[in-house]
Amino acid sequence: SLMWQQDERARVMMMWSSLPLFALALACFYRIETVVDGFVVLTLILFAAALVLPVSIQFVNSMVLNRLSRRNWKLRWAASDAFAQLPQLRVALMALLLTLTANIGVTTLVNSFRDALSNWLEIRLSADIYIQRTVGNIDTLAVTDGSEWRIASHQRTGVSTRWRGRPAIVQGVDVSAPDIVDMQLPEQLSDASVPWASLSVDPQPILANEQVKHLGQVALGETVRLESAGQQYSYVIVGFFHDYGTPYYRFYLPSDVVKQRWQNVRSEGLALWVAPGMLEMAEQTLIEKGIDPGEWIRQADIKRVSLEIFDRTFQITAALNSLTLVVAGVALLAALLAVHQQRLPEYAHWYSLGVTFQEWFKLVAFPLLLMVMVTGLLAIPLGWVLSWMLVYKLNVVAFGWTMPLVWSWMPVMQLAMVTVMVVISALAIVALQVRRRLPVALKQLGGMGL
């Protein structure tokens, strides 16, 4: 028909229009320097993929038709009906594709961040008890007193400064403390394990957080200069460490160096490693030394509270994902109502030829589910691309830290189930509307025949 030919030309034009968008996205990808640049690339990729969707649906539907034998005439009829539904469902399916892609990409980003944060906390908070910096006699507590429950301790010190126009923190650490020894460095010089703790090397080796690398634009092995009491000191960066959630530049130096070169050095609290089974004994000892229970916290409590805060923070993301899916479902419902209202006279012809309502439902449901399936399958690799961009590009440009991408099929399966429920609900509403209006269409068909 003329309508089908026009729609076929439109699909071909959309496919060809996607090619320059893909090419432009590829060209801009290698020039991403800001968050805006990253979102421009994402927009180009998503819209280009959406333009390819109608042709993809047509291709898959044609393959299904070619594989069905002529004896399965009902299935062939149902598959052919997709060509009648696609012109008016095209925009709604493109919106559904973008919704599913965003849902998969953002969910993967959040899960990757949570996994990275949890693993980082396992090492960063490896001590059993953390005493607040406000405790008056913290210096005496840091000294090993021969207690049988104490395995190790780590008293961090710190001083606030500025580096390249932004707030920075220089922390003094005990290089032999368990959390420093076990600290994972995503990037380091080959000989960084010992030299960074040396006091005799000039320039002094130093560790920096990833924000220094990605936001401060400093490479491994380069020299940075930090000011103290009007004097500039040079340090060579021998490694970068993860530092999730902080907006500051952070540097690690041995505690002796920090105390020698900076004034007003403050305590950053005390970490205590306790022998297995002796946690209660350790807490009782702290109470006997005049430290109230509110002035220290257990490792497990810190981790639990940290992850609870994380989960509450990103609950809004899950709510927005659900909202966008509902909006896409409403758009699909509106498109379905429009297409089936327009085809009521055609359905009246089917009914007069002996097609039952159940057969009608199968004939119109099969192509819709097929089109939604193609949309969902295309959303999976597109969602992976989105999550890859968010994790390895936008996250680094915006916050300055890196993390591995953690892909899980469980959220994808859950999203697929919810999508099927939304589509079936829309189909059910449309079926009720058609069933209610079909008798009127039959009467009109009978009147035309008189």
Language-model features: locations:
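Alpha-helical transmembrane segments, especially those used as permease/efflux helices
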Residues: 1-97, 101-109, 414-429
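Juxtamembrane segments of multi-pass membrane proteins
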Residues: 52-198, 202-203, 210-211, 222, ...
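Conserved transmembrane alpha-helices of multi-pass membrane proteins
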Residues: 5-21, 316, 364, 373-374, ...
